[in-house]
Amino acid sequence: MVNSTKYEVAAQHEADDGSALGDGASPVAEQVKLKKEISLLNGVCLIVGNMIGSGIFVSPKGVLMYSASFGLSLVIWAVGGIFSVFGALCYAELGTTIKKSGASYAYILEAFGGFLAFIRLWTSLLIIEPTSQAVIAITFANYMVQPLFPSCGAPYAAGRLLAAACICLLTFINCAYVKWGTLVQDIFTYAKVLALIAVIIAGIVRLGQGATANFENSFEGSSFAMGDIALALYSALFSYSGWDTLNYVTEEIRNPERNLPLSIGISMPIVTIIYLLTNVAYYSVLDIKEILASDAVAVTFADQIFGVFNWIIPVAVAFSCFGGLNASIVAASRLLFVGSREGHLPDAICMVHVERFTPVPSLLFNGVLSLVYLCVEDIFQLINYYSFSYWFFVGLSIVGQLYLRWKDPDRPRPLKLSLFFPIIFCLCTIFLVAVPLYSDTINSLIGIGIALSGLPFYFFIIRVPEHKRPLFLRRIVASITRYLQILCMSVAAEMDLEDGELSKQDPKSK
């Protein structure tokens, strides 16, 4: 693992331990680091592209199922958007104050130290990132393959192979050049937004033609039971997840003090308005029974409205998944990169290609994890395990924001919010942590167990000083690192001291 001089290539290991990063390190390698190639437009597309996934096309019925009326469901969609704006604004302050990539991992590390940060990283490594990427890839594959089998279900193997090819292709694109990855993100974000605009325009035309029956007495039959409202809001917030995407790549943003909060400020209203108007469009054509009975609401909508052009929506869903998967790969690879740099993962993962300046090892590691999870037949079941963990660590990040306000009040903060925003958000995340514990207790407890399974690794590996680890183990790790350097043409990266902050102490000591 990385020691206290982890940002200097030649000092990571002693040569007599068989290190791959010993005396032979080139002086030039010390200058290799991730470049600032993400513009304001790229940032907006990353956030919008990750937030707008397949959910708004396929299953927006979760909110309607629990709210039981069109009127209340639209209110809950709006509340979910406002809540997400609060969270995104808090992350904008954190991202401009702690200018490290890694999002909540970096913020928890700064506020509370290495232990909680490692558990956050462990949960992402084991469940959150590979599971979500595998599910997105499978959804993409299903929408691409199913039209070839109109009268029966698509073969299982065909879907999984196409999903694997999708993960491999996007991993290669992001390994090649950062610009290629951002270009893919921009193009597919435009495509999915245009598809939703087409749905919205069709809905507006229908309303203009007098199709307003579903909006008369729109609150009739509403379920105001706290349990139902809680589950409806939870469904809406799941669709809004992804607003923290840009915080995973803070160190690669041009002028982050300006572009990070501005990207968030532009993206959040766009997504909220699109979600609201898309649901209005659905409600103008489909009644409650049709929506709840549909496996893919947008496809059912297109069958009734677009006629021979109804193929547009399945293609749009596939495009949406492709763009969302690309954003997820970018974010997850940076999380692994930062985790390695902070000493919580093997050194090899925080290396950067010497010519292309891309984090090739972390991208490959992330890709391999996702491919492994594709082999899990009931992969969708794994999603149920991480709802509790996800919101717990998001809330803990905002608690860290409040703690740093108290602990370090004089710290430079380019963006400083009123305490109203983080306090309200913290109170709401308590609710979001409690909901799955109440409604899905078994799966939530399994998720907690998965997070706690990282304890032995932390106390028996991470916290053990490197010189006390078995020599054979150090040599094995050094050999793997050496071969990865050769294979990936990569060297350990320096942190950008101009925009980042060196750890004041080793996270392993906390």
Curated annotation (Swiss-Prot):
The keyword Cell cycle does not apply. Gene3D superfamilies: Amino acid/polyamine transporter I (1.20.1740.10). GO terms for molecular function: basic amino acid transmembrane transporter activity; L-arginine transmembrane transporter activity. Its main location: membrane. It catalyses: L-leucine(out) + L-arginine(in) + Na(+)(out) = L-leucine(in) + L-arginine(out) + Na(+)(in); L-leucine(out) + L-lysine(in) + Na(+)(out) = L-leucine(in) + L-lysine(out) + Na(+)(in); L-leucine(out) + L-ornithine(in) + Na(+)(out) = L-leucine(in) + L-ornithine(out) + Na(+)(in). Pfam families: AA_permease_2. It is found in: Basolateral cell membrane. Glycans are attached at residues 3, 326. The chain crosses the membrane at residues 38-58, 70-90, 108-128, 134-154, 161-181, 187-207, 223-243, 260-280, 305-325, 384-404, 417-437, 442-462. Strongly expressed in kidney and intestine. Weaker expression observed in epididymis, testis, ovary, thyroid pancreas, sub-gland and liver. It is a multi-pass membrane protein. The modification Phosphoserine is found at residues 19, 26. It comes from the Eukaryota. Keywords: Amino-acid transport, Cell membrane, Disulfide bond, Glycoprotein, Membrane, Phosphoprotein, Transmembrane, Transmembrane helix, Transport. GO terms for biological process: L-arginine transmembrane transport; L-leucine transport; regulation of arginine metabolic process. Disruption phenotype: A mouse model for human lysinuric protein intolerance (LPI), where homozygous knockout mice for Slc7a7 gene are born at a frequency lower than the expected Mendelian ratio. Only two homozygous mice survived, whereas 16 of them died within 24 hours of birth. Growth retardation is an ongoing feature of the two surviving mice kept on a low-protein diet with citrulline supplementation. One of its GO terms (cellular component) is basolateral plasma membrane. Signal peptide: none annotated. Belongs to the amino acid-polyamine-organocation (APC) superfamily. L-type amino acid transporter (LAT) (TC 2.A.3.8) family. Heterodimer with SLC3A2, that functions as an antiporter which operates as an efflux route by exporting cationic amino acids from inside the cells in exchange with neutral amino acids plus sodium ions and may participate in nitric oxide synthesis via the transport of L-arginine. Also mediates L-arginine transport in non-polarized cells, such as monocytes, and is essential for the correct function of these cells. The transport mechanism is electroneutral and operates with a stoichiometry of 1:1. In vitro, Na(+) and Li(+), but also H(+), are cotransported with the neutral amino acids. This is Y+L amino acid transporter 1. It comes from Mus musculus (Mouse). The lineage of its organism: Eukaryota, Metazoa, Chordata, Craniata, Vertebrata.
